[in-house]
Amino acid sequence: MLTQTPICDFGKKAIPFKLKSTEGKIISLEELKGENGTLVMFICNHCPYVKAITKDIVEDCNELKKIGINSVAISSNDPTNYPEDSFDNMIKFAKKNNFSFPYLIDETQETAKAYDAVCTPDFFGYNKDLELQYRGRSRELKNLIPIRDGKSDLYKAMKLIAETNNGPKDQIPSAGCSIKWKFD
């Protein structure tokens, strides 16, 4: 089911976390913090909306790194009901797509809940003070095909954050598959 992100809650502080990466390391938000901003992305392996923009995400994150913005991807989906989103498949997905940023597993789903993440992809763009400035889309999709007419909305927003510490006032929500929550 297609789910859209809510509007940006400007200034909301990033929630600290410590999660395991596909490299087997425990990584914290504090370690990831970029000099000019931090991009936290909730993604997964199986969602067609994520798959459609994975190349764009990787390219954007590589470019953002050059301007002092660090990026991290987190998968919070329930791998029991969605085996394609298992930790082993996360490792394969990160390697296949040449992730230059950490890909973390949120096994308890506490991080996704703390961030109020709703879908994959769900982007949280923070300034250098870890204050939320962007909660929009990567770029426009038409029939799950990215419209590549210049830099992505995500890149432009994060570049603005790096330059001014503030995100764009007008943001188009991200849309994708709902997070696959565990049910006890």
Residues of each region from the PLM?
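Chalcogenol-based redox active-site neighborhoods
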Residues: 1-162, 167-171, 178-184
